[in-house]
Amino acid sequence: MSTPAESSDSKSKKDFSTAILERKKSPNRLVVDEAINDDNSVVSLHPATMEKLQLFRGDTILIKGKKRKDTVCIALADETCEEPKIRMNKVVRSNLRVRLGDVISVHQCPDVKYGKRVHILPVDDTVEGVTGNLFDAYLKPYFLEAYRPVRKGDLFLVRGGMRSVEFKVIETDPAEYCVVAPDTEIFCEGEPVKREDEERLDDVGYDDVGGVRKQMAQIRELVELPLRHPQLFKSIGVKPPKGILLYGPPGSGKTLIARAVANETGAFFFCINGPEIMSKLAGESESNLRKAFEEAEKNAPSIIFIDEIDSIAPKREKTNGEVERRIVSQLLTLMDGLKSRAHVIVMGATNRPNSIDPALRRFGRFDREIDIGVPDEIGRLEVLRIHTKNMKLAEDVDLERISKDTHGYVGADLAALCTEAALQCIREKMDVIDLEDDSIDAEILNSMAVTNEHFHTALGNSNPSALRETVVEVPNVSWNDIGGLENVKRELQETVQYPVEHPEKFEKFGMSPSKGVLFYGPPGCGKTLLAKAIANECQANFISVKGPELLTMWFGESEANVREIFDKARQSAPCVLFFDELDSIATQRGGGSGGDGGGAADRVLNQLLTEMDGMNAKKTVFIIGATNRPDIIDSALLRPGRLDQLIYIPLPDEDSRLNIFKAALRKSPIAKDVDIGALAKYTQGFSGADITEICQRACKYAIRENIEKDIEKEKRRSENPEAMEEDGVDEVSEIKAAHFEESMKYARRSVSDADIRKYQAFAQTLQQSRGFGSEFRFENSAGSGATTGVADPFATSAAAAGDDDDLYN
């Protein structure tokens, strides 16, 4: 026996927040296994297990499954059954709502009576076309001399003659469970049971909610404990909590959780949809609320679930209508002024917790507010497994990979993704499916399975719902599309890809990754292109913010826009926020140019600064700014911690120009005699955009020539129909040197020398302001000076650009 101090010490190390979710070990909890003999009323256990539970062969036992379902069976011993397992067939499993591998509990059931009367009806889709008397053909042989136990509400399958028929136990007398003895009367008159009524899909249990393990534990503590064991709270002497407010983005499963809790606790579930309460008559709306609470009290223990609670309980000072205020007051008195409402728990759900009246958000009304957020990778995997458990998946589907690729998706988005993948699978089979036919070939149905390819296509077509407004195309630009700029690419990968792909390394070195990058340089050098490539390469979500869009004419609206964008980015983290033309919103403050709409630009900048620095380190949100006027950007933005890495993107040198030509002409057919190297040599001082322009113009000339040739050919053909075979040769099938020569006549440089001098001067002043420490050495590190002496990698690129033979000879 350990000393109390020790045991309490070991306890304190354990995390108790999810203790309620852990399975309790006890001998009567058994794991479900597949049955060998297929009998609906028999389960088999290992003799040792039966001995532990004090059962004898042939005893009737009560088995409890999920979602408050239970049934009665006969226990048999089976040596081959492993120790903590219980073998049951499919019918029993579906009555208990369990699958193979789930845990059920077994209880003795000594007081089962012989039934006087049972009422049994068939299920409609299994008796179509069955002729003759069902009782004689199916039920009589099934129950004859078998002494089968039945439970009211169970379904069972009877095999007979040609086919099997499913029956449902509608009513049993004298109790819910009884044994059908030879003298029991069996009624089977009545309409067959409809299958739709049976398979209620809204029977969700805890197994159908994924990705919210911690929140689920809190909710079960607050709901199940008071409803099932109220004496726990009594013995300690506290009042059990009364209300829970679930909040989070739409689609994260708030209503689903409430429904699962209601099904699993077996409590009476009363759902109030916010707007339904409202009525045009005075006093009517409040009485509707009162009725709902009264109804719930009558059927205690019960759960009242108010969906979209922000619609009926908005802040009283902000609402104009008298009715809304009265409803809020009524809700407050019902929730707190109640003669301590016994066993009634109120759950509310909303995605705008801050628009609810603050009086509701205190202890005693909504005690606990639980954030049902966007699930992480493990959570997404859980959700995907839940949604695909009934899907027919091919072998190659890699759910873990999919969960890695779906950053920022909530449960609803993942469900949509699975549906989209299934639709994709159906589309492929569309050529063999005829819509007019009444039925589809069984072969086709069996051959359908959702493959990894389908999921990939679906991933391309869907994006997280948090980003629906700022529709984000992850652009199709890869590193190969960008010529040159090797240094910049490496730096970018380190800034953005490492924190997303290797977060554990940053933890190991105890550092939070840098969050911001500013590209500056002459127009047309690929700043925007780089941002697109990084968004594509590192699988993060990508929001592009155009600077001027943020400014609006309304006071305070512009700052709200900035706030909203950052909120969205955090919700769908990891996310790259790309501010193009940053200088339009981040000009130096106090410029007082008079025409900036009452200082709107200054306020936007202040909002930006607070958002960037007040950003939670937990979320991976990167900011990339691009500008070609770095000199007018406010210096507060350029400090480390906001946009810490200032990357100068110079005009391309010869190698880079060659790469840009290659990247631009990657998909075009080019004649053998075109020397791209010569073009690259000749285009000294051209920006990337200028070079692309040259290529486009050359293509245009080739196309023009091609079309002219076609017209000429048509003409010749119409004049001389016989001679058309010979001259199919002189097609213009590629871009020739002549086209490039023609195009070079119109080529122009978009960046003047004066501009370049400006950029380089700026880059060098930055370099000087940064280069203070380049001579620094630790005292005893004479030998390792080589490693520490390397300055910022961009010193080289900026200097190289500067030394480029004084601009260019």
Curated annotation (Swiss-Prot):
The modification Phosphoserine is found at residue 41. Residues 782-809 are annotated as: Disordered. Keywords: Acetylation, ATP-binding, Cell cycle, Cell division, Cell membrane, Cytoplasm, Cytoskeleton, Membrane, Nucleotide-binding, Nucleus, Phosphoprotein, Protein transport, Repeat, Transport. InterPro entries: AAA+_ATPase, AAA_ATPase_CDC48, AAA_ATPase_domain, AAA_lid_3, Asp_de-COase-like_dom_sf, ATPase_AAA_core, ATPase_AAA_CS, Cdc48_dom2. It comes from the Eukaryota. It is a peripheral membrane protein. Phosphorylated on at least one threonine residue and on Ser-41 by SERK1. Gene3D superfamilies: 1.10.8.60, 2.40.40.20, 3.10.330.10, 6.10.20.150, P-loop containing nucleotide triphosphate hydrolases (3.40.50.300). GO terms for biological process: cell division; negative regulation of defense response; pollen germination; pollen tube growth; protein destabilization; protein transport. It is found in: Nucleus; Cytoplasm, Cytoskeleton, Phragmoplast; Cell membrane. Changing residue 527 to A: Abolishes ATPase activity. ADP binds at residues 210, 248-256, 387. GO terms for cellular component: cytoplasm; cytosol; cytosolic ribosome; Golgi apparatus; lipid droplet; nuclear envelope; nucleolus; nucleus. The keyword Secreted does not apply. ATP binds at residues 521-529. Pfam families: AAA (PF00004), AAA_lid_3 (PF17862), CDC48_2 (PF02933), CDC48_N (PF02359). One of its GO terms (molecular function) is ATP binding. The modification N-acetylserine is found at residue 2. Residues 791-801 have a biased composition (Low complexity). CDD domains: RecA-like_CDC48_r1-like (cd19519), RecA-like_CDC48_r2-like (cd19528). Belongs to the AAA ATPase family. Probably functions in cell division and growth processes. Interacts with certain SNAREs as part of specialized membrane fusion events where vesicles from the same organelle fuse (homotypic fusion). Homohexamer. Interacts with SERK1, GRF6, KAPP and SYP31, but not with KNOLLE. Component of the SERK1 signaling complex, composed of KAPP, CDC48A, GRF6 or GRF7, SERK1, SERK2, SERK3/BAK1 and BRI1. Interacts with PUX1, PUX2, PUX3, PUX4, PUX5, PUX7 and PUX11 via its N-terminus. This is Cell division control protein 48 homolog A. It comes from Arabidopsis thaliana (Mouse-ear cress). The lineage of its organism: Eukaryota, Viridiplantae, Streptophyta, Embryophyta, Tracheophyta. The gene is CDC48A.
